[in-house]
Amino acid sequence: NIEAAGSVKMGDDTDTASADKVGTMRYRTATDEPVPVTGTELITNGDFSNGTTGWSFGAGWAVSNGGATVSTASVTTDIRQTIPYVANISAATKFRYRFEITDITAGSLRLFVNKPTFTQIANVSAVGVYEYVVEVSTGSNGTFYLYSTSSSGSTFQGTVTNVSVLEVTEEDASYADMCMQTGASTYEWVNIVRNTY
């Protein structure tokens, strides 16, 4: 939006980034936005580039297709990782659990976290990137699980990768973003300014 008297007002533009928006800016706000405390990645080998290093794999899981994969039906096990930092917290702390399903042909995948009670956080059944902020209390053993059995009993067949866990706080914030070209034919809104309040 262009205002008179020479000033420029940014619209709250929620449109998808595209070629015709390159160079334009938008303003947005967010409530309880997860903000990394240090940015230190707590997961070991989240992209499975080092095979099963850092992970415990249940029967039926294997590293293939760029991630942890279940390729046959009726697999009712999990992959899991124990994070010492989470196990050693001295007060309730929030963490962002993130993973990507790059392929799925059946069932759904469930995320569980020891908070310290064994708690289901998500049950997802489509390709995509998923992230959840979970508050973990003292007494947790630091373990989280990706289960191949859905709550309905159907079993997951597919691939999960790019697993990440970060310590976060949740803040209200406002943002100024600019649309930028990030590849031959890809465009993204890139944050330029962030203000918490």
Task: Walk through the language-model features, giving the residues of each.
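Polar, enzyme-active/binding microenvironments
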Residues: 4-22, 29-175, 180-197
